[in-house]
Design a protein with these regions (language model features):
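Generic beta-strand structural signal
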Residues: 11-12, 86, 106-107, 139-141
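Phosphate/pyrophosphate-recognition segments in soluble nucleotide-handling domains
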Residues: 111-159
Length: 192
């Protein structure tokens, strides 16, 4: 298989939990790079950054995650290719499979903020932790426009809300479920 030469797209999370009212940060050891990093990974083809951030966090840490506010996007070069990593603040959600050491991640530690920043191999990751800790606690509020539906001119029904989705619209609606779940959305309000 030919090696890709285009931009690298990735997503990650500053994963937090509390212990006695103090925040702890999840840091990971990657044996191949011999470094300490935050949960992150490359997007699968056609994958949304939000879905990738959650998927990579679960895969690498064994913790399910609820995403919060977006953080700064890191941009740097890897083997002369531009890489961008989109980050979110994340908190643990009960029900993850639990951490199992593997060839990609062989150690996971939950550390106080200062110790986590000191442990990380890259200063830019420490900057993300400082940014994450500085964010207010929020509840996501997501505003969406409907996905692609049949043209109004072609629809003969009495109520526009019954206008069927196109094939693309149906695929978008299915993918939207995972996006909303990543933010732990529990209520949906709709207009006519």
């Amino acid at each position: 298989m030919a090696k890709s030469t285009g931009p690298i797209r990735a997503a990650g999370v500053v994963l937090l939990r509390e212990d006695s009212g103090q925040p702890l940060v999840c840091v990971l050891h990657r044996p191949r790079q011999n470094d300490w990093s935050l949960p992150k990974g490359k997007l699968d083809p056609g994958e949304n950054e939000i879905i990738a951030a959650r998927r990579e966090t679960i895969e690498e840490t064994g913790s399910d995650v609820v995403l919060g506010v977006p953080l700064a996007t890191q941009r740097y070069k890897v083997e002369n290719r531009p890489k961008s990593v989109h980050y979110w603040v994340g908190t643990e959600r009960p029900g993850g499979p639990g951490f199992t050491p593997n060839k990609e991640i062989d150690e996971l530690r939950w550390l106080p903020v200062a110790a986590a920043i000191d442990m990380l191999s890259y200063p830019r990751d420490g900057d993300l932790i400082r940014e994450a800790i500085g964010q207010p606690t929020t509840t996501p509020f997501i505003i969406l426009r409907h996905t692609e539906a049949m043209r109004r001119a072609d629809f003969r029904g009495p109520v526009d809300a019954e206008r069927p989705l196109t094939a693309d619209g149906a695929q978008h609606a299915v993918r939207l479920v995972d996006v909303l779940d990543a933010f732990d959305i529990r209520k949906v309000y709709s207009s006519d």
